[in-house]
Amino acid sequence: MNRWVEKWLRVYLKCYINLILFYRNVYPPQSFDYTTYQSFNLPQFVPINRHPALIDYIEELILDVLSKLTHVYRFSICIINKKNDLCIEKYVLDFSELQHVDKDDQIITETEVFDEFRSSLNSLIMHLEKLPKVNDDTITFEAVINAIELELGHKLDRNRRVDSLEEKAEIERDSNWVKCQEDENLPDNNGFQPPKIKLTSLVGSDVGPLIIHQFSEKLISGDDKILNGVYSQYEEGESIFGSLF
């Protein structure tokens, strides 16, 4: 793996995931620490969830994704309505142009990396701050990867003895992903109105090997029951589904 990708993408993903969980009220605000984690010279601290199990989960998720990065072209955090298990928001990082191999003539500075990632995270924060507030305990989240030529599930051997934490992690990373299809949970009936999605392009990164595109998707039209009870306030003149204009 390219040394710049390995070094800084891990920090970037930690900020990215925690910012979404905080601003979308996936977990209560009081479960986040606001005063200890600062990265990429952001003007404010990044809220980091304090729950030990979630800290471990996010750290392992990031290491898992990085271990598969040559196959992964998109990483998404999906916001799921607890009442119906449907995705109502999606935050996407596109890695399709990442450079995975070190180049001898490639010279970038830490300042350049910090500038790019700071702009990217600031773009995400400004977008999240404008979204309708989410009611308490109405949503959860899922991590999703889009991958090419990634084979999983071949290392699971119930008779195999696991002698180290490294072996345990290797087996879990091979078996803890579930294959799914886009929109597979949507209601299967003739009366269901297909959803309409609002796509918002956000600032990514374009420095050396760290070429990342960032965007978000938000459900704005469809069956009223999909979003019922999730959002507590809306922009003036906007319905529960937002505006199509």
UniProtKB/Swiss-Prot annotation:
> Which GO annotations describe the biological process of this protein?
error-free translesion synthesis; error-prone translesion synthesis
Gene3D superfamilies per record: HORMA domain (3.30.900.10)
Give the UniProt keywords, A-Z. DNA damage, DNA repair, Mitochondrion
For this record, the Gene Ontology CC terms, alphabetical, are: chromatin; mitochondrion; nucleus; zeta DNA polymerase complex
Could you tell me where this protein is found in the cell?
Answer: Mitochondrion
Q: Main subcellular localization, coarse class? A: mitochondrion
Q: Where is the HORMA domain?
A: 3-203
Reply yes or no: does the keyword DNA damage apply.
Answer: yes
Q: Which SUPFAM superfamilies match?
A: The spindle assembly checkpoint protein mad2
- The keyword DNA repair appears for this protein: yes
* A Pfam family: HORMA
What does the protein in this record do? Answer: Required for DNA damage induced mutagenesis. Involved in DNA repair, mitochondrial DNA repair and translesion synthesis. Has a role in the bypass of abasic (AP) sites.
| SUBUNIT field | Forms DNA polymerase zeta with REV3. Interacts with REV1.
The family annotation for this protein states: Belongs to the MAD2 family.
Q: What is this protein called?
A: DNA polymerase zeta processivity subunit
Gene source species: Saccharomyces cerevisiae (strain ATCC 204508 / S288c) (Baker's yeast)
